[in-house]
A protein has these predicted regions:
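Glycine-rich beta-strand-turn "strand-cap" elements at beta-sheet edges
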Residues: 15-19, 59-68, 95-121
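Short, surface-exposed ligand-recognition loops at beta-strand->loop->(often short) alpha-helix junctions
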Residues: 29-38
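An amphipathic, aromatic/His-enriched active-site/gating alpha helix that lines ligand/cofactor pockets
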Residues: 44, 48-57, 75-110
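Short, conserved catalytic or interaction motifs in soluble domains
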Residues: 12
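Short, well-ordered beta-strand segments in beta-rich or mixed alpha/beta enzyme
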Residues: 22-29, 59-86
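C-terminal motif of bacterial Sec signal peptides marking the signal peptidase cleavage site
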Residues: 6-9
Length: 121
């Protein structure tokens, strides 16, 4: 499932997508034998990702009821910064390391949400 949500009516000057923060919510499941390797690969990628100037938050959370199910939450200053992240060596390495780890019977989900910046400040 892929969902794109854009919120309008920002109080800080409009709802121009270029000026909005981008939140990604990704849900995925891995084969049981890949849980440790996924965590290790993600943590390496996270270390470099958090140093990117456009990254606001980057985390992965494991389900309490299913140890093979993970939730990834990312927040970026804008779409341009997210695009730059997609070209980084550390993300490409991570994606290469995990490419065969996914549970083929699980559909997963990907949501991209545009939000007004500094709403929580």
């Amino acid at each position: 499932t892929c969902v794109l949500i854009a919120l309008s009516g920002c109080t800080n000057g409009g709802s121009n997508k270029e000026s909005m923060e981008v939140v990604l919510n990704i849900k995925r499941k891995v084969k049981p034998e890949c849980v440790s390797a996924l965590k290790e690969s993600f943590l390496k990628c996270k270390e470099s990702t958090l140093l990117e100037p456009g990254c606001i938050d980057y985390g992965m959370y494991q389900s309490l009821t299913d140890s093979t199910e993970f939730f990834i939450a990312e927040t970026w200053k804008n779409d341009g910064e997210l695009q730059k992240h997609g070209e980084t060596a550390h993300l490409k390495q991570h994606l290469n390391e995990i490419k065969d780890m996914g549970d083929p019977s699980y559909k997963g989900s990907f949501r991209k949400i545009y939000v007004c910046p500094s709403v929580n400040d």
